[in-house]
Amino acid sequence: MLGTLFGSAIGGALAVAGAPVALAAMGFTGTGIAAASIAAKMMSAAAIANGGGVAAGSLVATLQSAGVLGLSTSTNAILGAAGAAVGALL
C-alpha cells in the first residue's frame, strides 16, 4: 500500500514537472518556437500542409500556446492524475 502511494506521488509530480521541460526540449519555449528545433520542423510541416499558415487549434498551435503561456490548472490536474495512475502501477 505504501509503495502504491509513493509511486502515485512520484508519478504525479514527475508528470506535472516534466511536461514543461519536455515542451521546452522540443522547442516550444516561453519566447516562442526555437529555431532548428523539433517544434520548428513541426510548424514548417503544418504550414506547408495548410497552404502557408498554421491552423488555429492545431497540435502545433496548442503546444506553442502551452510553451509560451504555460499549462492551465486543469491540464496540470489531468497530467497529475495520469502520472499518479501510472506511478501506482509501477
UniProtKB/Swiss-Prot annotation:
Which UniProt keywords are given for this protein, alphabetically ordered?
Answer: Membrane, Nucleus, Signal, Transcription, Transcription regulation, Transmembrane, Transmembrane helix
Instruction: Provide the phenotype resulting from gene inactivation.
Output: Homozygous knockout mice exhibit no obvious phenotype, having normal growth rates, survival, fertility and litter sizes. No organ pathology is detected. However, they display decreased restenosis, the narrowing of blood vessels, upon vascular injury.
Location of the protein in the cell: Nucleus inner membrane
Q: What is its main location?
A: nucleus
Give TM regions: 28-48, 67-89
Q: How does it assemble?
A: Homodimer. Interacts with SKP2. Interacts with NR4A1. May interact with BCL2.
**PANTHER family membership:** INTERFERON ALPHA-INDUCIBLE PROTEIN 27 (PTHR16932), INTERFERON ALPHA-INDUCIBLE PROTEIN 27, MITOCHONDRIAL (PTHR16932:SF2)
Q: Write down what this protein is called.
A: Interferon alpha-inducible protein 27-like protein 2A
